Amino acid sequence: LIFSLMLISALAKAGGMPLHTWIPDLAAEAPTSVTSYFPAAADKFLGIFKLTIICHILVSFGPTYSLVVAGIGAVTMLFATLTAIIQRDIKRILAFPVIGQVGYMIMGIGIGTPLGIAGGLFHMVNHCMYKMCLFQTSGAVQMRTGTKDLDRLGGLAKKMPVTFTCALIAALSISGIPPFNGFVSKWMIYQAALEVATRNPVYLVFAVVAAITSSFTLAHAIKYAGGVFLGSLPKELEKVK
């Protein structure tokens, strides 16, 4: 019971499922100055660190606990990333992968090996960098165009080349494409899951889920970068600088 209550508090701080529902609304409604720094907020850092301390210092973290925490991470990353694909608000498109990337951190910590824990914490640091960049680009687009609606955007790469370049680099990073930083931390988590899978095949399923989620992350990143910056430029955006 004590472990369950502490786990709930850590998930609420970090934004893991099922305590993630506040994140998309915050990202969609808050000013860019808030959303851009949200991935690196102290609360999220503390949530992940708290989870690490709970799992590996405060309790006797056996195989059952490990399976539960890693499973929560796998479900979180898959559900949140799939949900991002159906969004039309560019900030909500970016908000759900915030939750999904937390799933990778939770899974790494849940696996419990030194490589898994290091991968989860390293992914937290990487997440702060590329997600802040993505939110900054969405804020720049909203400021210049006056809209967050993906259906009213497009073709902005020529008008905002620096913003497009930053969005592209961050999109490749969050998708785990080598040689960008997201690939390194995700690879560490994959390897940790495969290492433990020799003792429990369920972790092989978790590794497959993580890899599939990365492909869905690429799909949502393409949707954001392509929908905003590529394609034809709407007439009402021809004066954008």
List the predicted regions and their residue ranges:
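Hydrophobic transmembrane alpha-helices and their helix-loop junctions in integral membrane proteins
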Residues: 1-241
